[in-house]
């Protein structure tokens, strides 16, 4: 330690001089003592100075030491915190798979403790020794320390790293040169484009807009933090693949950028060869849109519509010629020409597929998958929706050959897999009819056409499907939805917003194109199967073409005139072989003339072997905005689970489009098989006009056995669940009626009311089997029962099991709602069913074996009946629903109708079920329903039996006046919704002879359901005390069964029992007639509240409870003998009939009532025993 700054004084100088001056100089000892004393004092003073200096030095050292120690402790604490927090940060970072967030997040949010000021690395609290190292490094790296620049010699290889000027000037010069080059190029492009712009678009406007757009790109990239935005702008311009503003199409910069954003466009959209010397097709464009009225559904078209007398190609280009190369090829064809169809393979190509044998499901599935994978490449230069209206065009028929080429408009959306139909997509980029270049794809043909091979049958028995351009053109804004699932589930979606009116599907798993028209035009073409002739089975994979429009241009007048002129035209289908973009060869097809008859044109455009189905008449079309009708497909050979498949040779058919109407006021002029449904599948029947054609062997609306794959109809209506279609189901054609009271009289006059089947449950209105719409049934309905139904399946139907789902055993949902209104009188019933008495008598043997089926599940709320067990509903004679404004519509009923009426009489409602000639239901009752199975399943399905749509239906209950009484179905004791399913198909059309002579068939069931009738009586009586809108009417509807308990306050009910008993004794005379205004009222579950524990009242909790129970047990508790064989029920007024199961039934009923009633204080006093 340096002590140089402190001067150490002499000890003698520090000492006091008097110490040695006062001594005697003569005496040496005295002088020595004085000098030593002075030196000692000086040393002590020197030690004091040293101590002061030491204190000053060590004080500073102590302060620095204490500061360092405190900072070390702080660092140790921070280190402990970091060690604790590190795993929680390390695990998410190391487990993160996507590191893209590292590039976009600034990183400050990860480190919240860091200061966000200027000094992030060196905060002010750093030690000075560390801060000095930062303060010294102020300047840039000292590049002069590098090696000197050497042009040649040993240091020349280090030029780039040793020359400082290269590092300084390279980046700036490159950026300046690039920017100048880009600006010059843009100016040249603007000048070039400005010379070609139209009158309305000046070069100055294009330059300024273009410059502003690039400036916008520049600013955008600067804001995003890109280092060199000029290069990014250049990359965006490189993607435009051409000049930014197209003079021919008039497309703007941004439109072209948006349209070319798909990477598939370059591959799909190739322009047609202009140098080929083959067929020339002039293309012109319509200068303005023309509003054509929607075709009238009832009246004929008014004037003012534009008539197209010739089939001509309307187009797009400024008289540029698009040429299609053709190579002649001769094909010898029969009268039955080969099938010419379009198939979706290799991104929609024109092809002719040879199918000499039936397509196997595996091959067709693979084709569908290949088509779906190739459709992803399908794209178009002009997507509908970008302000480019699409127009429908006509094809010009030349003397020798016709151009029926379709552009690639299979749009495949990656979200939904939407597939649309092959059509000539002629686009108008702007309403000002700017000229188009050929590369703008006036008629875009796919470069990758698949090989087109003529389909020539070995036996020469193919069918020629003429693909006419006016019938195959599409003009729409939104394509249809046909998603294809990996499990081959075809799902038909009905979008309310798009108002898709029709979907055509094919269960043969053929790669089939379908289109759902918008609200303007509809055409359905079904692809049928050839008749089995000569032992060969020709199943041709064909496609369905639709004509539709969503813009203001209507094609009604166009196709109307084509209908009038098509009879003498020569229609040629383009049939070519080995067509590809590389070879560039087309083959003209042979000419075939079609002479259609007027009957075929009027009805369904039916030809003997040319299965072409078009519209019936434009006046007969009823476009639906809310539902679809589906043309029934052909059956698949692989599906024969039920053993009741029909002969395919009898099913040469054309399925006509069944039009559904939202208001229900418009129907076709010719009678069809109409069904009132909401979202059900429909298979329309052929018209009567087509029956007069002898060439149509057997025209049937045959719906066959469908493919085993499950097909589901998905509707946007939330009340319509996804209904699985069973294997053997066929669909009845239906017409949606949202407002049944507004049926037009003119429309009703055209359709006989006896042919209307009311099937109006919106959830499970799947009706019929493969026999339901058979050819015999179609002929019988259209000829108004001039022919009787023939072989329609086995009468001895097998019983459907509870375990097997409907999709496996081919069961059908037979479900209806109380919209079915019974006939008004017994006389009318007898008059309606007089010709069918022999049918009723023949079915009586099957009725006696009828038992109740418990085939309901909670998910699929329809009766589980095998398709074999259902005969065609050919004589269902319901009346049309009549609205009664005086009576309010019934709420969703909890108990069945039989509980309210109380007429649990044994003499069979099941004969009335089969008495209508509809079905022979062999329904089997489950034995488990005896033991108190009074369930509240009705409340789980309130919407199933409710009358919706705001209609006031008067539900009349009628009584027969002659030999028999009207009796409800014994299935009412089950309490589930299958009671409704049976009661809705009971038309009450049996005669007095039938109802009384068949009364013995249900006597065997009396012992089973009589005991359960007691619980139902309690239930109905309790419900009556909650709802008393019509007390007088409900008194007459009290259950006509004996009370198990005698209770006070029931004198009036006893009198009702005596009246009913006297009525049963005089049953043949028919003295008592129920009021026709009886209203069945249901109780909603929301109206009832639960009873609290303390307020529960037990059944029969009265003074005489013990006595009455003892009397019951003493008299009839073990009386299990079968009922007597008399036609009348054996009612005893004084002593009720019961057994030991009554207690369990009553307990269950009481528990059910307490669960449903709720704790209502007003009704606690008057409980069951009132």
Curated annotation (Swiss-Prot):
InterPro entries: SCAR/WAVE_fam
Record-given protein name: Protein SCAR4
Compositionally biased residues, Basic and acidic residues: 198-207, 366-376
GO molecular function (one): actin binding
Compartments in which it is found: Cytoplasm, Cytoskeleton
Chain spans, region Disordered: 180-207, 356-376, 631-674, 701-742, 783-819, 960-980, 1026-1046
The keyword rRNA-binding belongs to this UniProt entry's keyword annotation: no
Name of encoding gene: SCAR4
Subunit note: Interacts with SPK1.
Function: Involved in regulation of actin and microtubule organization. Part of a WAVE complex that activates the Arp2/3 complex. Regulates trichome branch positioning and expansion.
Domain topic, free-text comment: Activates the Arp2/3 complex and binds actin through the C-terminal VCA (verprolin homology/cofilin homology/acidic) domain consisting of a WH2 domain followed by an Arp2/3-binding acidic motif (A), separated by a conserved linker region (C). Binds BRK1 through the N-terminal Scar homology domain (SHD).
Keywords: Actin-binding, Cytoplasm, Cytoskeleton
Record-stated family: Belongs to the SCAR/WAVE family.
Keyword Cytoplasm tagged: yes
